[in-house]
Amino acid sequence: MNAPLGGIWLGLPLLLTWLSPEVSSSWWYMRATGDSSRVMCDNVPGLVSRQRQLCHRHPDVMRAIGLGVAEWTAECQYQFRQHRWNCNTLDRDHGLFGRVLLRSSRESAFVYAISSAGVVFAITRACSQGELKSCSCDPKKKGTAKDSKGTFDWGGCSDNIDYGIKFARAFVDAKERKGKDARALMNLHNNRAGRKAVKRFLKQECKCHGVSGSCTLRTCWLAMADFRKTGDYLWRKYNGAIQVVMNQDGTGFTVANKRFKKPTKNDLVYFENSPDYCIRDREAGSPGTAGRVCNLTSRGMDSCEVMCCGRGYDTSRVTRMTKCECKFHWCCAVRCQDCLEALDVHTCKAPKSADWTTPT
């Protein structure tokens, strides 16, 4: 019984030396660049040669990726909105999230997955909207096909998600493929899980043709679901993420706890336990929860007890403008008055210790 555990602990120092400190995906910083392809490609720090090649060759795709960064970071912040770490970004950091993702935690796993998914979504959408020279609608969706409802014709514009996945794999994975360390393998696994998540929610939409909508003829196409579907799915995967260690030959993972199942390609994996994110810690990249708004009546992660880590909270009375006395007017409008509403806002207290922040 002791041998397997001993093997894990003896391998831990080696594992930690394999966890590269340079893990931030520098392409995330593309959200802050301008429209000039050469300026964008040459000034985003940390891109590897393959990424710069793709950047120079496909400036229109890079613009789509850059616009998509705002979308997937917003989705990350939505999913973590009630948690101590709320996916906050740092505008001046080329890694976008600061040092917090240097730890191979489940938060890192989620961010790599959602960012990879965001690239697939942004590129695929741009293809369908005719914004990219290198792709368009899915060329394979032509002719006649069958489903459970009968025969239909492929028509409209099916989202070319295979192109989005192919380009995302080539661009996003390029940096990790240059490394042989454990963290690179972790990132590659979670990147793939993110890409697969987008395709999971590809759905068939159809339009009926015929007298009075009789649907004697159908035209169908494939369309991506709203990105929130992908975000919700990856959030569930985050909550069920599997802690792993490297196998002995350094080519893959094995579960850290033998009682848990082996991770599938759809699961998120991580190496290190997360910090509690209670205290601001510059070294760990944790902003802490001092000043965060908490919910006094909640029993969840956003409750004042959990969010404030037992430090207590301050309450302030604020007023806000709301719509009130709304009435329906025929036809067809709803008209409301603007009213001032007073409410209590609860924010987490800072730690009492004078040295709660790491000195600069």
UniProtKB/Swiss-Prot annotation:
Q: Which UniProt keywords apply?
A: Developmental protein, Disulfide bond, Extracellular matrix, Glycoprotein, Lipoprotein, Secreted, Signal, Wnt signaling pathway
Q: Where in the cell is it found?
A: Secreted, Extracellular space, Extracellular matrix
GO terms of molecular function = cytokine activity; frizzled binding
- Carbohydrate-modified residues are N295
Which superkingdom, per the lineage?
Answer: Eukaryota
InterPro entries reported in the protein's UniProt record: Wnt, Wnt2, Wnt_C, Wnt_CS
Q: Which PROSITE patterns match?
A: WNT1 (PS00246)
Lipid moiety-binding region (O-palmitoleoyl serine): S212
Q: Where is the signal peptide?
A: 1-25
UniProt PTM comment: Palmitoleoylation is required for efficient binding to frizzled receptors. Depalmitoleoylation leads to Wnt signaling pathway inhibition.
Which Pfam family is an annotated match for this chain, by its short name?
wnt
Give a Gene Ontology cellular component term annotated to this protein.
extracellular space
- Disulphide bond pairs: C76-C87, C127-C135, C137-C157, C206-C220, C208-C215, C278-C309, C294-C304, C308-C348, C324-C339, C326-C336, C331-C332
Per the record, the GO terms for biological process are: animal organ development; canonical Wnt signaling pathway; cell fate commitment; neuron differentiation
Residues annotated as coiled-coil are none
Family statement: Belongs to the Wnt family.
Q: Cite the PANTHER family for this sequence.
A: PROTEIN WNT-2 (PTHR12027:SF86), WNT RELATED (PTHR12027)
Instruction: State the function annotated in the UniProt record.
Output: Ligand for members of the frizzled family of seven transmembrane receptors. Probable developmental protein. May be a signaling molecule which affects the development of discrete regions of tissues. Is likely to signal over only few cell diameters.
Instruction: From the Swiss-Prot or TrEMBL record, give the protein name.
Output: Protein Wnt-2
Q: Which gene is annotated as encoding this protein in its UniProt record?
A: WNT2
